[in-house]
Amino acid sequence: GVFILVGLDGDHHVRKLFTELEETWQHTNRVRIVFGFNPKLAEQLFAAADFCIVPSYFEPCGLTQLYSLYFATIPIVRKTGGLNDTVFDLADATPTKPINGYTFLDADIEGVNWIVGRALAEFLTPSYKERQKNACKVDISWTNSTKAYLEVYKKITSF
């Protein structure tokens, strides 16, 4: 496999750790770290990737998983904020929507290792392909959200 990290981080210590990681694996040509953001590169990576890992501690909305779903790149996310509202997994007690990714609770290395292991074990199986099909069907347009907002506004303006 190939690991690519793209992101912005002002923390010098974190940048140094990822730079060292890339240097350590440089001879394999399988690790690439990109600091900064390039929309064209991001689109190409989403379209080419099999998985997108978003292990956020906090995520009020989350666009990364939405881009991922759009390109049928299976999101692997921590159940928090907007990630929890848009990515559904069989591991959820009662998934209300069709499964379209992998979710985990524990914000630690064990949690990430567990979910990545689970995702890799299912890679290219019927379960993985079902997630891809469901990912393509996710409606991320404003159509439904707009209708919901209009209903709220109607309720609060009619006394």
Model feature map: region roles:
Residues W142-F159:
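C-terminal alpha-helical cap of glycosyltransferases
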Residues K16-F18, D89, Y149:
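Short aromatic-enriched loop/helix-cap "lid" or pocket-rim segments at secondary-structure transitions
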Residues P39, Q44-Q132, C136-K137:
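Catalytic binding pocket for nucleotide-activated donors in carbohydrate/polymer assembly enzymes
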Residues T19-E22, A91-A93, F159:
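Short low-complexity, flexible loop/linker segments enriched in glycine and/or proline
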Residues D11, L83-N84, L150:
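Positions that flank functional sites
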Residues F3-Q44:
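Nucleotide-activated donor-binding/catalytic signature segment of Leloir-type glycosyltransferases, i.e.
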Residues H12, I109-E110, T143:
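Loop/helix-junction capping segments adjacent to catalytic residues or to phosphate/diphosphate-binding pockets
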Residues G1, T73, I140:
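Short glycine/serine/threonine/alanine-rich loop segments
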